[in-house]
UniProtKB/Swiss-Prot annotation:
The lineage of its organism: Bacteria, Bacillati, Actinomycetota, Actinomycetes, Kineosporiales. Pfam families: Flavodoxin_2. This is FMN-dependent NADH:quinone oxidoreductase. It comes from Kineococcus radiotolerans (strain ATCC BAA-149 / DSM 14245 / SRS30216). It is an enzyme of class 1 (oxidoreductase). Its cofactor is FMN.
Length: 210
């Protein structure tokens, strides 16, 4: 059966645009038929533990002699790997927090990026599998603007999911999400609303076709 792994990381449980867009994707996916199943992991409501030992970055065979990371954390890493390997599509809600991904999402990436297991040349069981990244950004980071290049969220996800894991990364983006809140951004309200609607439409289209 076609299976979706749906991850959210926004701390905003009421008005998050990344959550709204990932929900639109997941709802459209389910609407394709009963066989289209979903596993939802909320990284904010149920945060993962940071690595307790640096050797957790490595598979057991590559760890230093005497290394003994907590067994329960190795078991959690194995569970997270099983979740992503079971998915035909991975959906990642990734709001931009202080110019990068939320720390809760970064921990998930750390658990996934284990050289020789899911990541690295010759060990990419997820190669070619679609990953849909929903990026919501409070401001704008247009080419040629003073803030060009300040978004360090999407590049991280492209490198880890795309380059290291070999996944086929699709990015759905909505900007100016703070225009309704900050008076100094009022001129961007119309743009923010239009980008949000476009992101919803793009997510639904991907959910129908992937």
């Amino acid at each position: 059966m076609p299976h979706l792994l749906h991850l959210d990381s926004s701390a905003d449980l009421a008005t998050s645009r990344s959550r709204a867009v990932t929900a639109a994707f997941a709802d459209t996916w389910r609407a394709r038929g009963e066989e289209y199943t979903v596993t939802h992991r909320d990284l904010h409501r149920d945060p993962l533990p940071h690595f307790a030992d640096a050797e957790q970055h490595w598979p057991a065979a590559a760890r230093r002699p005497g290394a003994n990371p907590p067994a329960e954390q190795d078991a959690l890493t194995a569970t997270l790997h099983a979740e992503v390997l079971a998915a035909d599509v991975v959906l990642v809600g990734a709001p931009l927090y202080n110019y990068t991904v939320p720390s809760t999402l970064k921990v998930w990436l750390d658990h996934l990026h284990i050289p020789g297991v899911l990541a690295g040349e010759g060990s990419q069981p997820l190669a070619g599998r679609p990953a849909v990244v929903v990026s919501s950004r409070g401001a704008t980071y247009d080419a040629g603007s003073p803030t060009e290049g300040w978004d360090h969220g999407v590049p991280v996800l492209r490198i880890v999911l795309g380059n290291s894991l070999g996944m086929d990364v699709h990015v759905v983006q909505t900007s100016a999400t703070l225009a309704d809140r900050l008076p100094e951004m009022a001129a961007l309200k119309e743009r923010g609303a239009a980008e949000f609607q476009a992101a919803l439409a793009a997510a639904r289209e991907l959910a129908r076709t992937l």
